[in-house]
Amino acid sequence: MTDTRNGEDSGKLLYCSFCGKSQHEVRKLIAGPSVFICDECVDLCNDIIREEVQEAQAESSAHKLPSPKEISGILDQYVIGQERAKKVLAVAVYNHYKRLNQRDKKGDEVELGKSNILLIGPTGSGKTLLAETLARLLNVPFTIADATTLTEAGYVGEDVENIIQKLLQKCDYDVEKAQMGIVYIDEIDKISRKSDNPSITRDVSGEGVQQALLKLIEGTVASVPPQGGRKHPQQEFLQVDTRNILFICGGAFSGLEKVIQNRSTKGGIGFGAEVRSKEEGKKVGESLREVEPDDLVKFGLIPEFVGRLPVLATLDELDEAALMQILTEPKNALTKQYAKLFEMESVDLEFRSDALKAVARKALERKTGARGLRSILEGVLLDTMYEIPSKKDVSKVVIDESVIEGTSQPLMIYENSEPQAKAAPDA
C-alpha cells in the first residue's frame, strides 16, 4: 500500500474509491491494489468502528449487573456516609435491573412490579450525587428534572413529558435505550399541595403536577416530540414506554420532621408536654428515619403519588467530620479538583488540616451541606487563581485557617526563595 499525494507518481488524476473526491480535494490519498482511500474516509471508518465497539461494551456491561454490595462499594468512592441510603438504593436498583433482564423470559407467570425511589434528606446531603453515580455505574441514560418548573398540560411551564424528552436527548433519541434509563426528579417536595383543604382555585404547579406525574412514574406510553415540545405540534411523535424507566424523586422536605414529631409525641398538652423537648433534641436525620407514608400525605403529597414511590431512603445531615471527609476522600474530592487546577500551572496546592476544619464549620453555619463547600473554596482561592497564571516563579500555595477566616492571604512559596505571604487587606 502506498501513499499518493498531489499526483507525484503519475500525471493521472486519482480519486478516492469510497467518497469519489479527487486527490486535490483531500489531504492524503492512500493507494491499494487498484483502489484508493482518502484520509477523510479513514477517519470515518475509525469513528464507525469506535462506536460499534463502545456499543458492544455497553451491551456486555448491561448484562453483567453488579451485586448490591458492589453497587454500594462504588457509591462509597464518591459519596461519604449515608450508609443506609446506599444500601436501600443498591438493593432497589439491583432488583429493578434484574427484573428488566428477566422480563423477556417465557413461561414465568410472576410479573415483577417496578419500585421507584423517594430520597428524603437535607440540602447538600448527596441525593443528586447518589443518583448520578448510579447512572454512571450502570451505563444507562440519566437525566435530572426540576419539579419546580413543571406545570399541568395547557399552562405556561414545562409538561411532564419534557422529562422523557430530556432523557431521549441524552441517548441521541434511541427509544430502546431511553426505556432502560434513570430519571431523577429534584425538589419533589416543592410540588406538595398548598393546603390540606380543597380549594376552588386550581393548583397547577402543586397537586396538578403530582396528578400529571402519576401515570408517567407508574408506567405509560408517553408521546414525545423529537424537539420543540408544544411549539411544534406538527412533528411526528415518538412513543416511549415508561414502565421500565426507574424514577428517583428527591427533596429536602423542610418541616417534615415536625410532622413526624407531632405524630410520634403521645399525650401531654400544657404541663404534660415535657416529652416534646426530648423529641426536639433529635437531629433532623434521626426524625426523618421514622417517616411513614401518612406523614408525607400530611406534608402535601397526594396518597396516590406516595403509593407510586414504595422505596424510601432518608439521608442524614452532614456533620463537621463528614464534610472534612468530603473535602479530601472521594475520587472527585474538591481539594483534589483545585489541586489539579493549580497543577496545570505547575504549582502545588496544600490545604492544612485546620483550613479544612474551618471550611467545614463555615458550610455548617450556612446550612448548605456539601453544596456550600465549593462556593467557600471558590471565594477563598479567587484572588490566587487570578494572580497565579501571571506569576511564573510560584512553586507552592499553602492555605491555612487564617486564610479561610479572611484574616490573611494564602502563603505563596517561590522557587529558590523564602515563603512570602501578602498582608491581609484593611477592612
From Swiss-Prot:
Q: Which Pfam families match?
A: AAA_2, ClpB_D2-small, zf-C4_ClpX
- Where Zn(2+) binds, per the record, is at C16, C19, C38, C41
- Keyword annotations of the record: ATP-binding, Chaperone, Metal-binding, Nucleotide-binding, Zinc
Q: Which CDD domains match?
A: RecA-like_ClpX
Picking any one GO molecular function of the record gives: ATP-dependent protein folding chaperone
Q: Which residues cross the membrane?
A: none
* Biological process according to GO: cell division; proteolysis involved in protein catabolic process
How is the subunit organization of this protein annotated in UniProt? Answer: Component of the ClpX-ClpP complex. Forms a hexameric ring that, in the presence of ATP, binds to fourteen ClpP subunits assembled into a disk-like structure with a central cavity, resembling the structure of eukaryotic proteasomes.
Q: What is this protein called?
A: ATP-dependent Clp protease ATP-binding subunit ClpX
Origin organism of this chain? Pseudomonas putida (strain ATCC 700007 / DSM 6899 / JCM 31910 / BCRC 17059 / LMG 24140 / F1)
